[in-house]
Design a protein with these regions (language model features):
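Mature, Sec-exported extracytoplasmic domains of Gram-positive
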Residues: 1-206
Length: 206
């Protein structure tokens, strides 16, 4: 089928149990109608590095008055990868992430104070470190939504200088859904090219 958002979904014939012991995904989702250059750039710059797995920045409702809703310990590794262009290596921090290092990165991308981060995140006050736990079979169950890819489909410049990005969570596995959820992410860009996330709203109850 061809979707209204410009995706073509088809399904391959794949073996099924009992021929195989594991389910084989034959679903394929291909974008036919291209995004604009600006939409592609915004997708890569602001949302693709975050995704919907291991953090809740893009998949929960929050704003500058409700910063306590974010999972700061989960968000850290994704912001780290965005800033440094390399994966966060937990082996470098066997005893937790040092306070100053954790807080400075979070405050670079989110409008929170060090005091708020200590209150909202899991903070080891004795050792002055923040806890980080790798996702695994004991603390995470993969979902189709979690593996979805965020894609900016609309960009709106607001009068207050912020920008609202309309984002679709595109799932190309099994369910082949070009918008598992749609949400509006508000960001503010600085003259030097840096930016902060200011809020997220799930549209139509997800």
């Amino acid at each position: 089928k061809y979707t209204d958002k410009g995706w073509f979904c088809y399904e391959l014939c794949v073996p099924e149990p009992p021929e195989v012991t594991e389910i084989v995904d034959g679903s394929c989702l291909v974008r036919i109608k291209p995004l604009s250059k600006e939409q592609r750039e915004m997708s890569e710059r602001c949302v693709q590095g975050l995704g919907y797995q291991g953090n809740n920045l893009l998949c929960s409702n929050w704003d500058t008055d409700h910063m306590e809703k974010l999972d700061y310990n989960g968000i850290y590794e994704y912001l780290y990868a965005m800033k440094h262009q390399k994966a966060f290596d937990a082996e470098d921090y066997p005893n937790g992430i040092p306070k100053e290092e954790f807080e400075s990165l979070i405050m670079e991308y989110l409008p929170v104070t060090a005091e708020q981060i200590q209150e909202y995140a899991v903070f080891d006050e004795k050792n002055q470190t923040y806890v980080w736990v790798r996702l695994g079979c004991l603390n995470y169950a993969p979902t189709f939504f979690g593996t979805s890819l965020p894609e900016v489909i609309d960009i709106k410049e607001n009068e207050d200088g912020t920008v609202t990005l309309t984002v679709d969570a595109v799932c190309d596995m099994v369910i082949c859904d070009d918008a598992v959820i749609t949400h509006e992410l508000t960001v503010k860009f600085a003259d030097d090219g840096s930016f902060q996330y200011l809020g997220n709203e799930i549209l139509d109850d997800g």
